[in-house]
Regions:
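Exposed beta-sheet edge and beta->alpha loop/turn motif
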Residues: 258-282, 286-289
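Short acidic-hydrophobic surface loop/beta-edge motif
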Residues: 252-253, 263
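Short loop/turn motifs at secondary-structure junctions and domain boundaries
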Residues: 193, 243, 263-267
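A solvent-exposed, acidic/Ser-Thr-rich amphipathic alpha-helical stretch
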Residues: 208-250
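N-terminal regulatory/sensing modules of transcriptional regulators
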Residues: 190-196, 201, 281, 313-314, ...
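Low-complexity, intrinsically disordered terminal/linker segments enriched in charged
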Residues: 288-324
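Active-site-adjacent scaffolding segments
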Residues: 2-192, 198-201, 205
Length: 324
């Protein structure tokens, strides 16, 4: 692999954090490489640091996409939530359901860590395009402000202010640190209570001021506005469970590097749930139902289903029933 192509993974990491969309991140990186290969060999050789050039171009493309994305969201049906990432065991290793993932798929290019938790991405989405790009370049990817200024097209001082403003937004929204085991336990208990249609148990797990946000994109049924309050959410969740089809299943999965849930019908992912936990309660639930945002999950569930179908059924020698 050439040194230029070796930058692809890092660029996808960068673009996903900037855009909150795997598909848009892939488009941005493809456009970046298209511009590189549109240059002559002499022009390419004249560039002292190809990696820096690629980063600058990709960041500016993302900056432009963020501006147009805001305009598109004015006509978006319902709430907009960033695209969820499948669990690292399926994607970060390049394996999907035990098979090699398509190397062109951006989902297996993203490093799963705290900086792309759903709560973090949602706060990023509240920033201006310039704030978001400056913050990600400096605070997440550790670029010096002099380089950030060159990329964003503003002064060093202006970029410091942008990053500082973004940092205040992050700190204002951050919940106190939660141990991974506690987070996983809360999500698991929520699943059990939801499966049991136990309203009281659900209320006990939810913050009284909790919020449930759904993104259907106008393509599937979804609440158009956030549902507020622990008791309302509990009753809403139980109402959904009572209407759930017999071919449905609720599964524990890792979503953006943290414990989450996935709803499937006939083995196909139809909703991905991400959670924010604070002070021993669930503070926010994001439910992504827009099928355009679930493509990596549907690929994964298809591979899981195929792997299951490929397994031989147990023969008589595996039976545990005593027929004597």
């Amino acid at each position: 692999m050439s040194a230029v192509m070796a930058e692809r993974r890092r660029l996808i990491n960068l673009a996903y954090r900037m855009l909150g969309s795997l598909a848009d991140a892939e488009d941005a990186v493809q456009e970046t490489y298209a511009r590189w290969y549109a240059m002559s060999a002499e022009q390419q050789e004249a560039i002292e640091s190809p990696g820096a050039w690629l980063t600058t171009v990709a960041s500016r493309i993302c900056l432009n996409l963020l501006g147009s994305a805001r305009a598109r969201r004015e006509t978006y049906v319902g709430e907009w939530i960033p695209e969820p990432l499948p669990e690292p065991g399926e994607w970060a290793s390049g394996q999907v359901g035990g098979r090699t993932a398509d190397p062109a798929d951006p989902a297996d290019r993203v490093t799963l860590d705290e900086s792309i938790s759903m709560a973090f991405l949602v706060v990023l989405d509240s920033m201006t395009a310039a704030e978001r790009v400056a913050f990600i370049l400096h605070d997440v990817f550790r670029y010096p402000f002099a380089e950030v200024a060159e990329i964003v097209g503003r002064t060093d001082a202006a970029c410091r202010q942008l990053a500082s403003s973004a940092r205040r937004r992050i700190h204002a929204s951050q919940a106190s640190a939660v141990r991974p085991a506690e987070r996983a336990s809360l999500v698991r208990d929520f699943k059990k209570a939801w499966d049991a249609k136990d309203i009281s148990a659900l209320i006990g797990l939810l913050d009284p001021d909790a919020t449930w946000t759904v993104d259907g994109g106008g393509l599937v049924s979804a609440a158009l506005h956030p549902i507020q309050g622990g008791e309302r959410i509990a009753r809403y969740a139980v109402g959904l469970a009572r209407k759930a089809p017999d071919n449905g299943a609720l599964l524990e999965r890792t979503v953006n590097g943290q414990p989450g849930l996935v709803a499937q019908q006939d083995g196909v992912t139809v909703t991905v749930f991400a959670f924010e936990v604070a002070a021993g309660r669930i503070r926010h639930i994001w439910a992504i139902r827009n099928p355009d945002k679930l493509q990596p999950w549907r690929i994964a569930s298809h591979e899981e289903r195929s792997a299951s179908e490929d397994r031989p059924l147990p023969g008589p020698s595996h039976s545990t029933t005593n027929e004597d």
